[in-house]
Amino acid sequence: MPLPTREVLRRLPKAELHCHLDGSLRPETMIELGLELEKTMPAPDAQSLREYMTVDDARNLEDYLERFAITLSVMQTEPALERIAYELAEDSAADGVRYIEVRYAPVLNVREGLSLEQAVEAPLRGLARAEAEFGITGRVIVTAIRNMAPSVSQELAELAVAYRQRGVVGFDLAGGEVGHPAKAHRNAFEYARSHDLACTCHAGEGDGADSVRQAVHVCGAHRIGHATRLIEDTSLTDYCNDRRIALEICLTSNVQTRAADSYASHPFREYYDRGLNVVLNTDNRLMSGVTLTDEYMHAAESLRFDFDELARVALNGFESCFLPHEERVRLIAEVQREIEALRSMDS
């Protein structure tokens, strides 16, 4: 079967489950907010800033994360946070994304006086506006940071639970893995789960399969962010497959951080062929310089995914999202009808 075209993949209804708010700003917006908030940007215009922010020289995950200090400098006010969330949803909708879970750490947005509550409510307003205007459903995942104290993670878990009925659908842990084990934050995960909040966890990106094991067995994560090195542990891979634990795959980001040597050698193809529940995501649209359609194209061109396989990956995203069951079922039914129409067009 011939490879699907970019336009077909753009029109394919997609779910984005792993997208960082502070890694997905428009460079044009960064320039404008920098002037407005008197924050110095490392480049004078949007195109130069885009090139600067796109990571192509990282030695590892920690190198990749350094640029987030720049985006966070203009994410310290309510209007900025609302605008950035709105624009991310707008851009995603134009890329064929029907549902997006936007994740970020509100504790990083309170350096200039915002409360944690304000740092949650502003992006939620932006996502709600975008939903009304563009038809894209947007929800929030509150993220804790591995190298911060477990007490901070606990505070963020409590914050996420407080907004569980108001647009926050999950709790997450991110940041450099090496030397910052997920098990140190187990109490925060336990609090979130015991208050009926879904959990995901970055693992197996900057560290080995044991990091995934901690995320699954100690923290009780329902999904795993990246899981690039899960493949190193056959037993754990089988466990994740048997339990249908979703793997949030981010191809370009993994190549940038050296978690994978290339697109062609990424384990995504093997995960799919073994039946694992895999979902494609952008991770950071700005730092990785990608859209979700780009990631689907990489899977087609470098890993020989055909339309039917990528349609299955797209459905995995909707089936694995953290929406309530009834909302999820309605969304899946709509998506399946669109996929059938596209399938006839692609054949």
Question: Language-model features: where?
Answer:
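Metal-cofactor-binding active-site regions of metalloenzymes
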Residues: 1-197, 206-211, 218, 222-223, ...
